[in-house]
Regions:
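Conserved AMP-binding/adenylation subdomain of ANL enzymes
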Residues: 2-9, 17-55, 69
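Ser/Thr-glycine-rich phosphate-binding loops at phosphate-binding pockets of nucleotides
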Residues: 1, 110-113, 172
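Short, well-ordered beta-strand segments
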Residues: 9-12, 156-157
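Conserved ATP-binding/catalytic segment of the ANL
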Residues: 139, 150, 155-192
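Alpha-helix capping/helix-boundary segments
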Residues: 43, 62-63, 89
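Gly/Ser/Thr-rich phosphate-binding loop
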Residues: 55-58, 67-134
Length: 192
């Protein structure tokens, strides 16, 4: 779903024990022989180095830190693929990065299910505004779905080939609702 090829250059800044660090891009890139660069996250270094790469995965906290640097104002991200997830991704962050020219994928996944299970790719601000105009309560998870889903007792249940549970339903404990356009929104998480 992220268009990674053997010619891709992956910039991994998420911790490797984190699904966004290892599973979302790094391991798939390794498997196909793409170039991988792994380093500890630093917002200033990110802005200096990002244009040497084709793909990266950030968390919303990374995105906010990057957007607060002085370098972000003049940063050109044209053609770069940025996947963002691990925590809910708000419209402000999506807009900031898409306005910089990148392809921005809002992503939801879990280690148990697969790192890229539900997502939406934004290539221009018009698409962001269209999705935002159709938003419901919560934050967007996506509308491209790579597993079977059902919402039962308000929580998202998943199964499928990308899940470690295969054909058994797994309760994610995420409180999820779909709008009339089948866009998934996370509205919270059960704590018990």
């Amino acid at each position: 779903s992220q268009k990674i090829s053997s010619k891709s250059k992956i910039y991994t800044i998420c911790k490797m024990e984190h699904a966004g660090g290892l599973l979302a891009q790094t391991l798939p890139a390794y498997e196909i022989g793409a170039e991988i660069h792994i380093e500890k996250f630093n917002a200033f270094d990110f802005c200096k180095k990002i244009n040497n790469f084709t793909h990266t995965h950030i968390t919303p906290d990374h995105g906010r830190a990057i957007s607060l640097t002085k370098s972000f104002k003049n940063l050109n991200l044209n053609g770069l693929w940025i996947t963002c997830g691990s925590e809910p991704v708000d419209w402000e962050l999506i807009t900031k990065f898409v306005e910089k020219g990148c392809i921005f994928m809002v992503n939801w996944g879990m280690t148990e299910i697969g790192p890229c299970a539900i997502n939406t790719v934004f290539k221009n601000i018009e698409t962001v505004l269209d999705y935002k105009s159709k938003a419901i309560k919560g934050t967007l998870m996506g509308d491209d779905v790579y597993c079977d889903t059902k919402i039962e007792n308000k929580t998202l249940h998943v199964k499928g080939n990308i899940s470690v549970y295969a054909n058994e339903w797994f309760d994610t404990k995420d409180i999820v609702k779909k709008n009339i356009y089948n866009h998934y929104y996370i509205q919270g998480r059960l704590t018990n």
